[in-house]
């Protein structure tokens, strides 16, 4: 039983650990309390649990307005029915646990905590995939799905750090705009990512577009991380 558990957990969680460790250790100025980071990871996983039910409801709702075989349905399904639900769950974890926490006091912290929430979500999702489809899926998910969730978290954290700066400066309108961007930007890039993998788009043979998109996403996420940890300062 123990061997089976390890056989499932190691391939499912190893890429999560590697990415989280990398992002965490880049925080040179004031490293975040590891216990609190892991708490955010845990709640990211917990908040992912109701997402499947909400997504099923959203897809049923959207099918009343769009032909399920259409490109329009694929776009709405993946942006509103999936990406919005999943990114909102991560955004809520951040707002409930991190936003007013005293440890969220440097700009790079936003990325650390948003990526932590995203990887918590990805961790449980990955465990369920490995249980359902076997360890064979873990390689593809380690290359694409888990780094994808981390990338969405990078952009969320970037905008939430900007929102916190405006909140502290009592610039409430700018704060709200940045909070909206913190949800909207990850939702759109996540939605387009899933859209390119949908059956409707697969019929158009646009796999090369997907790979180019992933490379560009990873490149820009790395540039954001690099900029944020090099210019890190107190909020």
Task: Provide a role label for each language-model segment.
Residues 1-235:
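Hydrophobic alpha-helical segments at protein termini of multi-pass membrane proteins
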């Amino acid at each position: 039983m123990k061997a089976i558990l390890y056989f499932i957990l190691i391939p499912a969680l190893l890429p999560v650990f590697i990415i989280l460790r990398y992002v965490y250790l880049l925080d040179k100025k004031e490293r975040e309390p590891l216990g609190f980071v892991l708490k955010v990871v845990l709640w990211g996983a917990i908040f992912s649990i109701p997402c499947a039910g909400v997504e099923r409801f959203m897809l049923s709702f959207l099918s009343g307005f769009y032909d399920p075989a259409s490109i329009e349905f694929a776009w709405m399904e993946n942006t509103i029915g999936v990406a919005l639900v999943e990114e909102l769950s991560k955004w809520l974890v951040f707002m409930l646990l991190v936003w007013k926490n005293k440890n969220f006091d440097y700009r790079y912290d936003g990325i650390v905590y948003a990526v932590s929430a995203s990887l918590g979500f990805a961790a449980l999702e990955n465990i369920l995939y490995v249980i359902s489809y076997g360890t064979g899926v873990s390689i593809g998910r380690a290359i694409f799905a888990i780094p994808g969730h981390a990338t969405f978290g990078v952009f969320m954290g970037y905008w939430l750090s900007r929102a916190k700066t405006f909140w502290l400066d009592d610039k409430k309108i700018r704060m709200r705009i940045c909070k909206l961007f913190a949800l909207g930007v990850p939702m759109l890039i996540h939605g387009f990512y899933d859209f390119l993998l949908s059956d409707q788009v697969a019929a158009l043979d646009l796999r090369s577009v997907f790979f180019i998109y992933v490379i560009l996403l990873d490149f820009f996420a790395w540039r954001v991380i690099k900029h944020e940890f090099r210019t890190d300062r107190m909020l």
